[in-house]
Amino acid sequence: MRKKIVVGNWKMNNGVAASEQLAADLLAALGSSFTGCDVGIAPTFLSLTTAGKVIAGSTIQLVAQNCHYENDGAYTGEVSAAMLKGAGCSSVIIGHSERRQFFGETNATVNLRVKKALAEGLDVILCVGETLAERESGVTGDIVSAQVREGLVGVSDISNVVIAYEPVWAIGTGKTATSAQAEEVHLMIRTLVTELYGEPAAQALRIQYGGSVKPSNAVELFAMPNIDGGLIGGASLNAADFVAIVQAAAGK
């Protein structure tokens, strides 16, 4: 039985004070030893240490939104995996659709980041997903398969990898893939991972859904056999909504 995982991706929202308050609100609502599912929050780089101090010693994990694939150097505006580890992060989101869309990340550069993060001892949330045009063209399977295959090149052990399926057309649009649509892609991903890494690894792999998950649809989505939690955007900025989604994942 895979333990569900819910991560709040705060994106470029909340300053330091607001991040501290939201982290405190979540801690107060969930408690310091919540074990119903794995829970993480991903503040901006600027707020990582502040939010991290609030949740230190609790079961809420500190997650980064991105990392660079080099250790250090002349990469203005970037942050290395080792720096994130040193700041208290346990995981990092890599390959989010917004990184691919707005910052030119490719499957190849995503793969470099994945390997560097794993080498530095961070767990990885690898994001994959198709655009509306790709879905309507019937190439969802091809796109997502390529993102998984190429994102994991050279990775022999995926025990510290979570895959997040985020249909780009359902992010921040109010549109949500039906539970059946999401489950179809999640099953396809698990089948592909079985081919690449074998049945035990594929069955252990957790696959999150990330596309306008809300308290109103979380229970139905999380009831699907291959949906193992959520990567939550907008709803994670509201403590009550995020807690409701976490409770849905925990079956409460």
Swiss-Prot record:
Main location (coarse class): cytoplasm
One GO cellular component term: cytosol
Keyword Isomerase in record: yes
Pfam family of the protein (one): TIM
Subcellular locations according to the entry: Cytoplasm
Keyword line: Cytoplasm, Gluconeogenesis, Glycolysis, Isomerase
Catalysis: reaction(s): D-glyceraldehyde 3-phosphate = dihydroxyacetone phosphate
Gene3D superfamilies associated with the record: Aldolase class I (3.20.20.70)
InterPro entries: Aldolase_TIM, TIM_sf, TrioseP_Isoase_bac/euk, Triosephosphate_isomerase, Triosephosphate_isomerase_AS
CDD domains: TIM
Catalytic site positions: H96 (electrophile), E166 (proton acceptor)
Pathway(s) it belongs to: Carbohydrate biosynthesis; gluconeogenesis; Carbohydrate degradation; glycolysis; D-glyceraldehyde 3-phosphate from glycerone phosphate: step 1/1
GO annotation, biological process: gluconeogenesis; glyceraldehyde-3-phosphate biosynthetic process; glycerol catabolic process; glycolytic process
Family of the protein in this entry: Belongs to the triosephosphate isomerase family.
Assembly: Homodimer.
Function noted in UniProt: Involved in the gluconeogenesis. Catalyzes stereospecifically the conversion of dihydroxyacetone phosphate (DHAP) to D-glyceraldehyde-3-phosphate (G3P).
Protein name: Triosephosphate isomerase
Biological source species: Chlorobium chlorochromatii (strain CaD3)
Gene designation: tpiA
